[in-house]
């Protein structure tokens, strides 16, 4: 729950001029100081407001087990899923990985549709990609993907339970990942050498959450209209007053 500290002096309500000063926040937390100092009056007159923790709903207390120390922690857990510390560790990593997959998925759904529409490439839309002929059947590809993903997820779970235990490549012994924080392996997985700062983590988790919502929106949009997001955008732009969600849901 946000903490608001107020220090005021009756002198600020006097007939003196007002001077304001704003201090910006950082590291995902808002720290704002607002000082009103009367011109020619005592320098002790001040008014300070400080918010130290974000809330997903203003005025609603955050659960005690969500302290605001995690990236993207705004106290949102209405079902109490993260009350168990072991569950919280897993959910943190699960959200991080699902957010990364969602960002890749949304880009993989949207960009080919855009590039095909403007004539740069010619590939099937994402919702028709499963009907294409590949080097193996869809069921075979699914089994292969399941086995590979299963192996990766087991390794990831081992790293969550015992950080750093899977940094060594089990096949190519000459390769290993540097020691680091769980979920941010670095090395070959960080070719641009981005530092895992709190600000970067906040941005990644926020973009990952947006991507998960966008992915769900693309699926629902296609089930309703039979088209992808870019085609729907072009249709809306062609007649903004009539090609809207209202007309679509109304069946017009």
UniProtKB/Swiss-Prot annotation:
Residues bound to chlorophyll a 5: 203, 221
Expression induction or repression: Down-regulated by UV-B.
Positions that bind chlorophyll a 1: 76, 95, 209
Binding site for chlorophyll b 3: 137, 153
Gene Ontology BP term (one): photosynthesis, light harvesting
Membrane topology: Multi-pass membrane protein
Binding site for chlorophyll a 6: 236
Coiled coil: none
Post-translation changes: Photoregulated by reversible phosphorylation of its threonine residues.
Transmembrane segments: 101-121, 134-154
Keyword hit for Transcription regulation: no
Domain of life per record: Eukaryota
Keywords of the record: Chlorophyll, Chloroplast, Chromophore, Magnesium, Membrane, Metal-binding, Phosphoprotein, Photosynthesis, Photosystem I, Photosystem II, Plastid, Thylakoid, Transit peptide, Transmembrane, Transmembrane helix
Binding sites annotated in the UniProt record for chlorophyll b 2: 100, 143
Residues annotated to bind chlorophyll b 4: 156
InterPro entries for this protein: Chloro_AB-bd_pln, Chloroa_b-bind
Binding-site residues for chlorophyll a 4, renumbered to this chain: 207
Keyword Cell division: no
GO CC terms of this entry: chloroplast thylakoid membrane; photosystem I; photosystem II
Note on how the cofactor is bound: Binds at least 14 chlorophylls (8 Chl-a and 6 Chl-b) and carotenoids such as lutein and neoxanthin.
Domain remarks: The N-terminus of the protein extends into the stroma where it is involved with adhesion of granal membranes and post-translational modifications; both are believed to mediate the distribution of excitation energy between photosystems I and II.
UniProt function note: The light-harvesting complex (LHC) functions as a light receptor, it captures and delivers excitation energy to photosystems with which it is closely associated.
Subunit comment: The LHC complex consists of chlorophyll a-b binding proteins.
The protein, known as: Chlorophyll a-b binding protein P4, chloroplastic
Biological source species: Pisum sativum
């Amino acid at each position: 729950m946000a903490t608001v500290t107020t220090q005021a002096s009756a002198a600020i309500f006097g007939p003196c001029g007002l001077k304001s000063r704003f201090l910006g926040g950082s590291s995902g937390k808002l720290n704002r100081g607002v000082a009103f100092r009367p011109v020619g009056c005592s320098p002790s007159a001040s008014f300070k407001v400080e918010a130290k923790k974000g809330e997903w709903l203003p005025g609603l207390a955050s659960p005690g087990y969500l302290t605001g120390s995690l990236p993207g922690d705004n106290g949102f857990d209405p079902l109490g899923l993260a009350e168990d510390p072991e569950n919280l560790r897993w959910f943190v990593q699960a959200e991080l990985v699902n957010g990364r997959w969602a960002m890749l998925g949304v880009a993989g759904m949207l960009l080919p549709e855009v590039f095909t529409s403007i004539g740069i490439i010619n590939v099937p839309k994402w919702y028709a990609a499963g009907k294409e002929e590949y080097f193996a059947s869809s069921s075979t590809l699914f089994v292969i993907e399941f086995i590979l993903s299963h192996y990766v997820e087991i390794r990831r779970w081992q790293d969550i339970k015992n950080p750093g235990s899977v940094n060594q490549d089990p096949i190519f012994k000459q390769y290993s990942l540097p020691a680091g924080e769980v979920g941010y392996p670095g090395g070959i997985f960080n070719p641009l050498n981005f530092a895992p700062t709190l600000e970067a983590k906040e941005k990644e988790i926020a973009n990952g959450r947006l991507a998960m919502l966008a992915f769900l929106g693309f699926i629902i949009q296609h089930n309703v209209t039979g088209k992808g997001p870019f085609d729907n955008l072009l249709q809306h732009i062609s007649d903004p007053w009539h090609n809207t969600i209202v007309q679509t849901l109304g069946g017009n």
